[in-house]
């Protein structure tokens, strides 16, 4: 059997019991090397197969083949495996190859939920996730989604906001949003949510400093009703108070 699990943003406290139990029961754990380090408390003397960045297909294929061979295998993703994780790729590979292998999907806490809880309550109304990584999605497509989300006044959670190879993508996203959102729109940033180097801060669309943002960051841009009170970012649900 192959269990594809989300381990949350990094803290053991943010892992689900189902994910922990799957790790404890597994014979073999497969994952990106950084993520396998985050769950080492549960892997003990189990066989751990680590791969680097941009090896997602190889990682999933290895996990599938081990499960086919009769092993109890866990494939880990950070956050939730079904949100920019390995769940979809595993199902695609199994389907395309017409394999008879049992796949179990175990949810985890995605970064936007963890970040929102640290910032206040910014996701109380409609929101969307947009990844700024153009490795698998053409940048013009991403730009169209940013514009549409801004015009629809969604609260927007930006994943993969900035890296050494994509230093300008987040700034470009904010430029696009400036056409539909006020410069005073609250923005919250959380780095390394649930990990030792966790940081968070609030700013605005117009005052955003992009330099500290990296791939461990989650950026939340509010909607027209979002405000900051006592250092907390709040998007009203719409109750009459």
Predicted regions and their residues:
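Class I S-adenosyl-L-methionine
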Residues: 1-103, 109, 114, 209
